[in-house]
Structures are given as C-alpha cells and as structure tokens.
Amino acid sequence: CGDINAPCQSDCDCCGYSVTCDCYWGNECKCRESNFAIGM
C-alpha cells in the first residue's frame, strides 16, 4: 500500500482504514487522515 505522504492514484493506494486520497492541483494526489474509517 502507499505511504501516507506519497502520491496516490486512488483511495486504494492509502494504507489502513483511516486514510483517504485527496487530489490537489493537477494530477497529484496525497493520502491524508480521515475522521471516519472506510466502510463505516
């Protein structure tokens, strides 16, 4: 899985249940912490 500070192409690249993928300017994405677990 991807590093929390590494670029990611999709939510699937982010580790664990508490991260999500945010896209900023251009095609660059970064993983960030989320308040809710995926699937809840």
UniProtKB/Swiss-Prot annotation:
Subcellular location per the Swiss-Prot or TrEMBL entry: Secreted
Principal subcellular localization: secreted
Disulfide bonds: 1-15, 8-21, 14-31, 23-29
Keywords from the UniProt entry: Disulfide bond, Ion channel impairing toxin, Ionotropic glutamate receptor inhibitor, Knottin, Neurotoxin, Postsynaptic neurotoxin, Secreted, Toxin, Voltage-gated sodium channel impairing toxin
UniProt keyword annotation of Secreted present: yes
Tissue expression remark: Expressed by the venom gland.
Superkingdom per UniProt: Eukaryota
GO molecular function ontology, one term from the record: sodium channel regulator activity
Transmembrane segments: none
Keyword Disulfide bond: yes
GO cellular component terms listed in the entry, alphabetical order: extracellular region; host cell postsynaptic membrane
Domain notes: The presence of a 'disulfide through disulfide knot' structurally defines this protein as a knottin.
Miscellaneous field: Is not toxic to mice (30 ug per mouse tested by intracerebroventricular injection).
Functional description taken from the UniProt entry: Potent insecticidal toxin that binds to two distinct sites in insect sodium channels, with close affinity (Kd1=34.7 pM and Kd2=35.1 pM). Its association is rather fast (1.4 and 8.5 minutes, respectively for sites 1 and 2) and its dissociation is a slower process (5.4 and 32.8 minutes, respectively). On rat brain synaptosomes the toxin partially competes (~30%) with the beta-toxin CssIV, but does not compete with the alpha-toxin AaII, nor with the beta-toxin Ts VII.
Family as reported in the entry's similarity comment: Belongs to the neurotoxin 03 (Tx2) family. 05 subfamily.
Protein name, UniProt field: Beta/delta-ctenitoxin-Pr1a
